[in-house]
Amino acid sequence: MAHPKAAEVRKLTDADITEQIDGIRRELFDLRFQQATRQLSNTHRFKEARIKLAQLLTVQKERSRSAASS
């Protein structure tokens, strides 16, 4: 899974970003659960999910700040 470019993330609507953030948080919860029960074999998925979550949260924060300043 390649990391999305910032420009690709910025093209998403606010609703899409919120939906993806919720999905990634659920995925991270599932990954932690799998790791705790020793069922997880691909530990690199943690890093990928955290990076994507950070990108989405950054774009969401940028939009909220620009809306507040306008």
UniProtKB/Swiss-Prot annotation:
An annotated GO BP: translation
CDD domains hit by this protein: Ribosomal_L29_HIP
Keyword hit for DNA damage: no
GO MF assignments: structural constituent of ribosome
GO cellular component, one term: cytosolic large ribosomal subunit
Protein name, UniProt field: Large ribosomal subunit protein uL29
Similarity annotation: Belongs to the universal ribosomal protein uL29 family.
Species name: Prochlorococcus marinus (strain MIT 9313)
Gene: rpmC
NCBIfam families with a match to the protein in the record: L29
Cross-referenced InterPro entries: Ribosomal_protein_uL29, Ribosomal_uL29, Ribosomal_uL29_sf
Keywords: Ribonucleoprotein, Ribosomal protein
